[in-house]
Amino acid sequence: LKLNVYGQDQAIEEIVDKILVAQAGLKSEEKPIGSFVFMGPTGVGKTELAKQLAKNLSIHLARFDMSEYQEKHSVSKLIGSPPGYVGHDEHSGQLINQLQEHPNCVLLLDEIEKAHPDISQILLQIMDNGKITGSDGKEADARNCILILTTNLGAEQAEKNTIGFSQALDGDYGDEEFKRFF
């Protein structure tokens, strides 16, 4: 991974450690292998790291661009339409289908800050229970997936301090924005 993703050695080591602990059977049975948030400005390799992780583990990458889920009604595309709405009988949502097809995957939710706040309820189901239930009652197992959220929260503040003489930031520039978002 370090050969393919430049400048993210610490993040790579943390992810690999978490995966090794999970593979050793030392993780909670009801939770995904790992849940990670990659924060930083555009172009630092957040999405690329997720892609390379899936490639190196030889597992499927299920990528969802969260800018497509900005409106409240678009959240139903992930878990399916509620009963009584058009499309309820057709199929489960995109996320449910991906997890049923590829239970061992890297689940990448790209640019999570652009999604509607209702997405957080779906994330809680995955992170707490290791599964998600669609609107039609179908359950998808997420215990063998690696959940990765990417965000640009705090990047604007970090970029302000990069010109001229300023104190170096120690990677915590987005903590306040992240807490406010969730």
Question: What are the functions of these language-model segments?
Answer:
Residues 1-182:
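AAA+ P-loop NTPase nucleotide-binding core of proteostasis motors
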